Amino acid sequence: PTDDEATAEARAKLADSVVYLSEGIPAIQLGQEFLRTKGGNGNSYNAGDEVNAIDWDRTTQYSGSVDYVKGLIKLRNRIAALRQTSYNDINASVTMLKSANGVVAYQAKDSSGTYVVIFNANNDAAAIDGVEAGKYEVLAANGTVYGDDDVKSVTVRKGSAYTAGALSATVLKVASADDVVPVISGVNESTTITVG
């Protein structure tokens, strides 16, 4: 309740990211993608329409969040490693990565490549030491899902860490030797890498 609008939206995007980028079948409540609120009423079954009605104007007010969820759905549909439903498949292809407090990070593999997924629930950026050195295509970071026409990349140098933005999810794809991906400008490659 004390967060400003930008922080509340970042938290909502992170929560949506956890749902859509986790294994299994995702499900959200109607309006979650546009920060539906019931005015703080945690038990609104008998509160009436003034509390329970869907405020469709919020789809415009929070269009960035709506677009982000659409991007997550497209990303999930494109990457089989994010849609596994069998424990055996998940166990065989998902590896947890070393990460900071308040961070969950894992690597998932499928026939299309190797992906790194990071959820940073901290109010500050966090260094993720478990991300191996190499070049990565950035599929999502800092509240943005990148499309095919907006390709980004980042290089993590040996001895450095990837820095995940505060209150955000990151999806990286290990770049193949054949990938030609523009590197984000302004990145000091000798230190910790941050996208955004």
Specify the residue positions occupied by each region the protein language model found.
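Short, polar loop/linker segments at the starts of domains and inter-domain junctions
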Residues: P1-A8, Y146-S160
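Loop/helix patches that line or flank the sugar-binding groove of alpha-linked glycan CAZymes
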Residues: P1-Y136
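Generic detection of short hydrophobic beta-strand segments and adjacent strand-loop junctions
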Residues: I54, I128, V154-V156, Y162-A164, ...
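Short aromatic-acidic-glycine turn motif
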Residues: G134-D148
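C-terminal beta-strand-rich structural cap/linker in extracellular carbohydrate-active enzymes
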Residues: V151-V180
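Short, solvent-exposed loop/edge segments of extracellular or virion-exposed proteins
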Residues: V183-V195
